[in-house]
Amino acid sequence: MFGEGSRDNATLSKEGLFDKLEIGIASDITIRDKWSCGEIKKPETINYRTFKPEKGGLFCEKIFGPTKDWECCCGKYKKIKHKGIVCDRCGVEVTLSKVRRERMAHIELAVPIVHIWFFKTTPSRIGNVLGMTASDLERIIYYEEYVVIDPGKTDLNKKQLLNDAQYREVVEKWGKDAFVAKMGGEAIYDLLKSEDLQSLLKELKDRLRKTKSQQARMKLAKRLKIIEGFVSSSNHPEWMVLKSVPVVPPDLRPLVPLDGGRFATSDLNDLYRRVINRNNRLKAILRLKTPEVIVRNEKRMLQEAVDALFDNGRHGHPVMGAGNRPLKSLSEMLKGKNGRFRQNLLGKRVDYSGRSVIIVGPELKFNQCGLPKEMALELFEPFIIKRLKDQGSVYTIRSAKKMIQRGAPEVWDVLEEIIKGHPVLLNRAPTLHRLGIQAFEPVLIEGKAIRVHPLVCAAFNADFDGDQMAVHVPLSIEAQLEAKVLMMAPDNIFLPSSGKPVATPSKDMTLGIYYLMADPTYFPEDHGGKIKIFRDVTEVLRALYTGGFLDERINNRCDETGRGIHIHEKIKVRIDGQIIETTPGRVLFNRIVPKELGFQNYSMPSKRISELILQCYKKVGLEATVRFLDDLKDLGFIQATKAAISMGLKDVRIPEIKSEILKEAYDKVAVVKKQYDDGIITDGERHSKTISIWTEVSELLSDALYVEISKQAKSKHNPLFLMIDSGARGNKSQLKQLGALRGLMAKPNGAIIESPITSNFREGLTVLEYSISSHGARKGLADTALKTADSGYLTRRLVDVAQDVIITEKDCGTLNHIEISAIRQGSEELLPLKDRIYGRTVSEDIYQPGDKSKLLAKNGDVVTSAQAELIDDAGIESIKIRSTLTCESRRGVCAKCYGLNLANGRLIGLGEAVGIIAAQSIGEPGTQLTMRTFHLGGIAATSSTPEIVTDNDGILVYMDLRVVVGQDGNHLVLNKKGAIHVVRDEGRSLEEYKKLLSTKSIESLETYPVELGVKILVGDGEKVSSGQRIAEVELHNIPIICDKPGFVKYEDLVEGISTEKVVNKNTGLVELIVKQHRGELHPQIAIYSDAGLTELVGTYAIPSGAIISVEENQKVDPGMLLARLPRGAIKTKDITGGLPRVAELVEARKPEDAADIAKIDGVVDFKGIQKNKRILVVRDEITGMEEEHLIPLTKHLIVQRGDNVMKGQQLTDGLVVPHEILEICGVRELQKYLVNEVQEVYRLQGVDINDKHIEIIVRQMLQKVRITDPGDTTLLFGEEVNKKEFYEENRRTEEDGGKPAQAVPVLLGITKASLGTESFISAASFQDTTRVLTDAACSSKTDYLLGFKENVIMGHMIPGGTGFDTHKRIKQYLEKEQEDLVFDFESESECAC
């Protein structure tokens, strides 16, 4: 029913491909005359004896064409010579049988039937056109009630519903001919046909103008949009009612014979059969003048049969087939993973491909892969046949195939020849990023397994425990050229997500190199000898391998055994005119290092190898880097073999201090237990403190063990230390479990079990410890299975939202920018500025601070790594850069705003699919992380820092802090958003320091953000020295501290209602706890200046769950604890929390228990309590403006009366709602918030993703605006439109002298943004297929095929990469005389030119 002239309205481009596609509602005439080749009258399919299609049935050859090529049904005409003849006996046209895939038919319906999509898909199109509710429509369509079509002389209203009794009453009163009332599809058809859309449109516009109610306006605007769609398109509303049903070609719903005389059939045949049977029965009934009740029932059944055909289960119970399974309707054919879109159009199976298990191929070069001979023979068969024919070895294809099967010697020679220079693609599923498919030169090998180079394993995430890979052969010259130039493994040695090398040695290779480059362990002076000095590298190698020396004078200094030198001996050697102190191992390693990098004279853990590869690429280019990588691989394997490093049980040392530390910990836990028993602390605090004690023990023992095995390494390498320190395998956490203790474990629900596993794997676990241990291990495995699916779905949504972001131009010329600075946590720099600005375009000139003559980077420069270093070293805090968030390209983004392509360090090229790269960069580590949880076996990973210690000498300065001096003379912090700074002692006054810090004129040595309740041990402006404790952090409670002296009075702390006394079972001590209640009580502690409680000096709201620490009428001093709110048990931090957090951010969901944020800058005040909510007011003292916040009493406030707050600052605990940031702080702040929050999740797991990828996703989430005032434009109130469309419409209106529209930016989640894309084909293939198609058809949408997805679906070349317009124009076509060389692969260079 869709696609009125879809192909007719499409414009054909030069290559015969259409460049746009229009969808519409098909009219009755279109179905009958344009699509159909005949009417189906019988429900029969095939004859049970002859197995031939029945005439006039669902497989009729007369309608659909012959079942055999060039043969009619009765056999009168056979062979191609009768082409085009229609047989006079059976009426079948003599043609190809494949027409049965194209020819459609139709079923002529006895009564009009409503198309289910148009009234059941929300919003109901028919309901909106007629202005009727869905339930009313349903009663009419399913023959329950009549609807008045023409009231005539009666007092009825048009569209009024009448039940049977009312209808009879009206007929009796006025007579049958006085009015028209009908039911079913016929009634809807008449109503739709009589609807005057133009006047309805005018009326709706008038109502929209007059209506003030926001909700009514939204409702009207939605209806108006649907009506406008019909008016502006060529669709007629009555086409939503069918008079004939189109029938799908028979080869798309086949009937396949099975063994044993049974048949397998498509569900569609059953559904069509039901429709035909009911339709034929209804026709017969109507001819017989049957009673109305029976006719009505039959009509309803026909409506239901057609409903089931189009969308089974949408109305009523689904129609079941054999085995009680719902039948698959036409809608199901399109929907979901196995629907037409995703199964057949976006993903296709390809020929010329094979699959096999992979094994390691250490002998291969970086650009090679080993291909089993048998597989290659099969894959390259057509090429072999052509070459054999060209050589004259065979003359027919059949004889060539026989020759191949025989395995004749010339076949192998030809095969060797053909695969030279013919790359193949290797792919490992799941293909999480573009490095999952790479091209290699095949090398023929024996056996049946594919061989893979060890260094590409990281990119494929492959190992050799049974992994399989698929091989694909690029056939055309263009495909081969692309594979060779763009996809070869040596071109893919850097990650597109971060620019870090991905092809770095790992495991054995790292171990071998680390062993070779280890610090000297043999010192000749310790053995009474002298350091040997060598003339050059050759001499060192000769001494190392043969034990001989070129010079007799050196021979005298040979070691006692006379065997030359040890690989880790300290020696001196002359290199490039300089004498260097090094080891023979390092000399050996430096033979493979490119000269330009200089002599590498330090140990080589994996991190440093990675840096060396990056440096190598920057200095000497790709070719030399790839050679260096291959040499690294060979050297690494050789040295690992020679070193013969293996681990023994004795190598796992148990720290001597273990028993002592454990005893101490048990004592501390006992103290905490005693405090709980005495009622000093709550159960939650006891739990938190216990866990902190064990976490500290864990870290202490882990460090002690590491020190112990590394100490031992000075004289002799401990293999365990070698493996961990080199980065080859294992980490400190695993070492801790082997030699110290397993530590705290988590329950399956994430809570931490209090008693840790104090044994380690060397000692062995007790039965109880083993069972606790298995908890964690199982949780890890279960999580992995579940989260992999989540992560895959996230990647899919990300790809969908960003798929059409491509680089469309060099420079958009924008003046907009974003500002970025280093990311810090306290005084620690998590991500330096240089890493954030590398590869980005600066949008202002950057000078050396204080020296305008020294230009570090020019406006419009793309920052190189050298420039980034200079800018960072100059101490510049933040710089302005261009970003995809501010790019003004009309479609896609520009190269300047994007910056460098991280995969090759060059400016990004036109046509690059940066959106998909961004989606893969964010999605791929998500999957990696979920797969990585179980490696720690569910160990609780918590962090605790109960104190702040300074590393510098200087002056301590408080910034934005409200403090009170406690009884012990220490300063207690009363607000949340403050910090303490350690600054260099320059002899200034405290005020000067504060002023300079606030204007960023001086930089602090250390900065520590401090929370409410932190105890600062040093006064403001006092001197501190390195190693001094400057503050203590309360980890377990949020304290409520008194800041004024006075006497306590409880307010609304009513026992049994707002508070309860809890008796500690162990001690009998009573604790007063504030509980949640529904009454009008608002628990608070008031402080009065006098014992008579007459003058109020302050009130403190007490949240539920808090434990009150003071008694009524008690005298209190500043700094005293009034109450404490336990922070609750610590849950383990894991990406399990991280992945849903990323999804929550990119889907723009409102977080549970969201925080309130300040809407204006001002001072906090409280205005009492109303309906169980506290009224918090932020007052701007300059303008007098006030903003009220109603905050539930159960929420914990993090501000107090008198605090200064900034716009957007949190007032209560919890996560911030992104939509509120947008509304209050604007688009820039929201963009910054989203990018930083997503980065935070990945940073916690040590995953490096460049900001630009997240920025692209955020850009896609913010591409729409909501109309607040349509002005004189054609836009509607409340409508969400694309920014570009909005600006374009406003420009047109202003040119015509009209008033432009006003709008506010909208934040959409990625799913919603994907469905809101301009291309209906892309949206339909993502989700909600039926709704998207219905929507598009009603307004006759046109898809201009601009994105990737829609082009893949239509079978066109994608408009990206080499398919991008600019590149397509460059493509040269082969001349006629060269055409025969296309498959002559030796002449590849001639063709490629």
Curated annotation (Swiss-Prot):
Taxonomic classification? Bacteria, Pseudomonadati, Chlamydiota, Chlamydiia, Chlamydiales
Q: Describe cofactor binding as the record notes it.
A: Binds 1 Mg(2+) ion per subunit.
Task: Name the species this protein comes from.
Answer: Chlamydia caviae (strain ATCC VR-813 / DSM 19441 / 03DC25 / GPIC) (Chlamydophila caviae)
Q: What does this protein do?
A: DNA-dependent RNA polymerase catalyzes the transcription of DNA into RNA using the four ribonucleoside triphosphates as substrates.
Known catalytic reactions: RNA(n) + a ribonucleoside 5'-triphosphate = RNA(n+1) + diphosphate
Keyword Ubl conjugation found: no
Enzyme Commission number(s):
2.7.7.6
The gene behind this protein is: rpoC
Query: Keyword set for this entry?
Result: DNA-directed RNA polymerase, Magnesium, Metal-binding, Nucleotidyltransferase, Transcription, Transferase, Zinc
Name of protein: DNA-directed RNA polymerase subunit beta'
Task: Please name the NCBIfam families in this protein's record.
Answer: rpoC_TIGR (TIGR02386)
Give binding positions for Zn(2+) 1.
Answer: C72, C74, C87, C90
Q: Which HAMAP family match?
A: RNApol_bact_RpoC
